[in-house]
């Protein structure tokens, strides 16, 4: 009370009815709003001896001593034990009819979200204000930068926003939402706004090229549950452990497997040791594809093996050849970059080649992107995920802050992501004024 004599206080909140009723006559609601903060639905409010859940049945009583109710977000959009959203309650609509504002609490970027949000905290905030049914009047968040940007930039975003950089390249389709390299993952990546749909090419024993994110079927399929485990082998040049590799099974056998939720680096090995030419197989598919005749369609061919890219370059200059640097680097010699520019049109590097990290925090930015740009090589960065555990703490557990740091901070040309929808939203209308 003493502080209110010297400072303007906009809100005073309390979980106790007695406290709010004792001060309601001392404040002008036009300058200071009283907020009843709800705790868990089964917890007891000490003044009325009712649970907070039962208090919601008497909103007119609350209106006598408060102008706002602050409720956990689960009061509005409950989440089931399966971590999927349940139908919304009528709380916001009912409270507005009673003349009360509604603030939602318990928002944090580094907590588990309902699967409906694809681990994107912005989607969660928008669910509370842009759902076609109701809109809360405010949110209480541990990471205020995220709702601030979401409401300012993405609220009521149309279907045809202005498109700018970066180029959005999927990682095994929308593999954050569906098992990678499946029709569902690719269809969602397209609908989510990806510019380039990736296909990590692996070869079957009968010479059929397939899209699969790993040459080891144990990594991406249910092969361990079937009779093919007798085909387990160890090939140190491919990986340290044992595996069941795609070139050990026919296409017909692989089609019987189920994909699991979870980079083509094997072309040279397949050609030298298995007699399978990825280059020939890919070129054959491209030559037969309608995409190859559509000049407006962009095709990128990626490899971490310079010899493979040189073979593609000798076969056709129609496509963009992308060299993948398959390890994190802090620097690059001009002579090395000059060599790369002889057989590649662009380069893929890892996120830590731009912003090194240590103990989950960022180090100083490298000049790798700047050096590659000096040789007119576009730079694409991999891999971007929405899950907060994949991001350094400097990004506030916000995937948009992370993307922005690479696009505006490091001037990369494209992002490779398991969640194309997030990158598409960022590109459409997102503006983050964050200096790292």
Spans of model-derived segments:
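Phosphate-group recognition and catalysis centered on beta-loop-alpha active-site segments
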Residues: 1-436
């Amino acid at each position: 009370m003493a502080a209110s004599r010297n400072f303007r206080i906009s809100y005073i909140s309390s979980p106790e009815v007695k406290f709010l009723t004792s001060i309601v006559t001392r404040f002008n609601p036009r300058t200071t709003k009283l907020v009843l903060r709800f705790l868990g639905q089964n917890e007891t409010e000490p003044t009325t001896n009712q649970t907070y859940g039962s208090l919601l049945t008497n909103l007119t009583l609350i209106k006598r001593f408060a102008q706002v109710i602050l409720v956990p977000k689960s009061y509005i959009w409950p989440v089931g034990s399966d971590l999927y959203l349940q139908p919304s309650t009528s709380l916001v609509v009912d409270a507005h009819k009673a003349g009360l504002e509604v603030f939602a609490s318990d928002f944090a970027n580094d907590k588990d979200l309902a699967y409906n949000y694809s681990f994107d905290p912005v989607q969660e905030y928008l669910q509370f204000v842009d759902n076609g049914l109701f809109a809360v009047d405010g949110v209480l968040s541990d990471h205020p930068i995220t709702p601030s940007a979401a409401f300012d930039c993405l609220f009521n975003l149309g279907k045809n926003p202005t498109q700018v950089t970066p180029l959005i390249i999927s990682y095994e389709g929308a593999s954050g939402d569906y098992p990678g390299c499946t029709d569902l993952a690719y269809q969602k990546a397209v609908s989510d706004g990806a510019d380039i749909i990736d296909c990590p090419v692996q070869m079957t024993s009968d010479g059929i090229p397939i899209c699969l994110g790993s040459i080891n079927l144990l990594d991406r399929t249910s092969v361990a549950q079937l009779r093919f485990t007798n085909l387990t082998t160890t090939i140190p040049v491919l990986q340290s452990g044992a595996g069941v590799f795609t070139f050990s099974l026919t296409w017909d056998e692989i089609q019987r497997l189920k994909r699991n939720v979870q980079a083509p680096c094997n072309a040279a090995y397949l050609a030298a040791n298995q007699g399978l030419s990825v280059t020939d197989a890919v070129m054959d598919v491209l030559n037969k594809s309608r995409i190859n005749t559509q000049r407006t369609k962009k095709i990128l061919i990626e490899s971490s093996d310079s010899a493979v890219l040189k073979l593609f370059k000798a076969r056709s200059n129609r496509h963009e050849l992308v060299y993948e640097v398959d390890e994190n680097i802090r620097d690059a010699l001009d002579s090395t970059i000059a060599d790369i520019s002889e057989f590649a049109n662009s380069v893929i590097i890892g996120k830590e080649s731009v912003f090194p990290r240590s103990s989950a925090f960022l180090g100083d930015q490298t000049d790798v992107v700047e050096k590659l740009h000096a040789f007119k090589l576009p730079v694409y960065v991999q891999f971007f995920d929405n899950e907060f555990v994949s991001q350094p703490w400097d990004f506030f557990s916000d995937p948009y802050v992370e993307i922005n740091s690479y696009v505006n901070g490091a001037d990369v040309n494209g992002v490779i992501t398991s969640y194309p929808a997030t990158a598409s939203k960022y590109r459409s209308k997102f503006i983050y004024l964050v200096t790292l």
